């Protein structure tokens, strides 16, 4: 049996059944295959949904949208990933959605998605943009990690100070 995947704002991750969080299907018979390099998109909730490129082989909900780029030689996957993630973050997809937003279900219909215009610069420019964003994101994550380690040290110091003084 294939491993189940969830699409979160942290990316596509293996479904954790141990913590009883999230939704569980009665049957996984209709789940769709997701291969490494496939795009998977939660288009059912444009406020908390997300899109990512899978790093895993597995299956995901039949309600998610799984797709690949048509022209892998002329299209840089990371460029399109960042473009679509920006459309979530900036609520561009939200403006095209329909449904019950007050109930947390604002969907991007297939026809709106398939006819959505995305700028297509030459491949070299796509790659340059994607590499720039990836480099900056990696740098930011390193800085966040450093800050988190520093915060942890201060928290430990605070505890030891209280212990020593009291």
Regions found by a protein language model. Give the residues of each.
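Sequence-specific dsDNA recognition surfaces
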Residues: 2-36
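Heptad-repeat alpha-helical coiled-coil segments used for dimerization/oligomerization
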Residues: 155-161
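Short, charged beta-turn/beta-strand-edge "cap" motif at the junction between a beta-strand
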Residues: 45-49
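Amphipathic alpha-helical segments
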Residues: 80, 115-155
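A generic structural signal for residues embedded in beta-strands
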Residues: 41-42
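A short glycine-rich beta-alpha junction/loop motif
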Residues: 58-65, 100-127
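Short, surface-exposed loop/turn microsegments at beta-strand edges and helix-strand junctions
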Residues: 1-7, 33, 51-66, 71-74
């Amino acid at each position: 049996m294939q491993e189940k995947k969830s699409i979160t704002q942290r990316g596509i991750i293996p479904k954790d059944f141990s913590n009883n969080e999230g939704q569980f299907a009665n049957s996984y018979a209709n789940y769709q295959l997701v291969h490494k390099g496939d795009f998977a998109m939660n288009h059912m909730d444009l406020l908390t949904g997300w899109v990512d490129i899978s790093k895993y082989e597995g299956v995901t909900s039949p309600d998610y949208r799984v797709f690949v780029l048509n022209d892998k030689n002329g299209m840089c996957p990371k460029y399109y990933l960042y473009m679509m993630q920006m459309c979530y973050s900036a609520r561009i997809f939200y403006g095209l959605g329909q449904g019950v937003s007050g109930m947390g279900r604002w969907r991007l219909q297939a026809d709106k998605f398939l006819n959505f215009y995305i700028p297509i610069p030459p491949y070299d420019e796509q790659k340059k943009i994607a590499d720039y964003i990836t480099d900056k994101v990696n740098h930011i994550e390193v800085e966040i990690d450093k800050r988190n380690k520093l915060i942890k040290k201060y928290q430990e110091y605070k505890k030891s100070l209280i212990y020593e003084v009291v």
